[in-house]
Amino acid sequence: MNSLNSATASSVTKIAQPKVALIAEGGGQRGIFTAGVLDAWLEQNYDPFDLFIGTSAGSQNLTSYLARQKGYAKRLIRGLSRNKRFFQLGRGLMGKHIVDLDWYFDKTKEVNRAIDFKTAKTSLGERELLITATNARDRKAYYLSPTGEEHQWRELLKASSALPFLYKQGVKLTPWLNAQAANETTQINKAQEDFFLDGGLAAPLPVREAYNRGARKIVVIRTVDADFQAQSAWVQKLRTLATAAGYCPKTLDYLIQHEQAYLDELNFMANPPSDVEIIQIFADETLHSK
């Protein structure tokens, strides 16, 4: 009887504990810094987190971290993202993807580059992983949970990294949208027909989202230096010039949205609620990766 009471009390205490969240920022090849941090943690078997939120390259880094594949993300960044097949500006002139995410993620099916989704699902357990994506229709951030099924997980990662103009209209996620999206469930049926783009457009630093989901200690791995500020004025000027030339105003609208969302999150981190601790991890020097 005493043993049962003790177990019950322990369970209640565990439920009452505030969540610890890990957020991995995007940043393309700059994600190699995040990969290094997570690899160091894997060496120490360090994983105290309850909630994971990844944006763009950050979602790939978190997946390999949960898969316990030390060195995996670094190999992909060095091997695939620098391959001439991955980025070809000339493909855009032929109406094709400038950044070939299809080729990139097909490569992750090969034996020597395979993501261990089974281990990732097992190590995640009852915890929560959210992969951010931006709806091309309403331009809102969606926070999507992989089911553990390999193809679905891979498509979520692709959508989270699909930059407009570079990867055309985006990724269609039907039939994988469900009530786990952060937006109202009444919107899900409509969103079944939508395309999804890079999560960094609407949720570049989803710190506020982690807080709203109950995290009271939030660790953020950044891919820019501590003094970085979004240059929204510069993007506004670029948009004016590009619109006058008739060049991709929609893409620039996305960039402006990204800058504003970034500034909003920086402001939240600079002026956080009194009941949250936010820890940011930066590189000592500015990263020169693309």
Spans of features found by a protein language model:
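Patatin-like phospholipase
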Residues: 1-55, 63-290
